[in-house]
Amino acid sequence: MKVRRFAGVSARERDLVVRMTKRCLRELCKKEHELPVSYAEACEALTLTVKARSERSSGCRKGITIDVSAYRAGARTLLEYPAFASDRLIGSRVDAEPIAVLWGTVAHEVSHFIQYRYGPDTRWLAKTYRRAHGEGFRDIYRILRARVVNPLLGVESGVGTRQSAEP
């Protein structure tokens, strides 16, 4: 994984985002999800940029960019796009811990990376991966929210109980 840290981002914040990104990739690269890539290959392919500029975070086939400004400011709301904001599993959440909100942001952007990088070659994503927040993206994001993020938010997802938010 190539990691870029913009000025103003502490080593602690960078390391936190790196651990979160690796945890998300580790979950998605399990055999049960049938991605045509190993965890090591996915890490090698991803470029992670961490910034603190009060801008949007993003994800594409080359990598992800995470803005930690909201985490620093203590943001307690995980906002999602209107198309799925009211979804029980992947929708928006209010009154969450700032670290859980950062987990949600990282999971969202890792989902975009997997969607665009491996979607065309993955059996269950091949027909649905193209649309930015379409069904392919939602399927990937559901996996991460159910198994990684929602347990931190205290949301019942049928998988485990509330866990520590530290990676």
Name the predicted role of every residue range.
Residues K2-V101, R117-P167:
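Metalloprotease/metallohydrolase-associated module, dominated by Zn2+-dependent proteases
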Residues G104-R117:
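Active-site recognition of the HExxH zinc-binding catalytic motif
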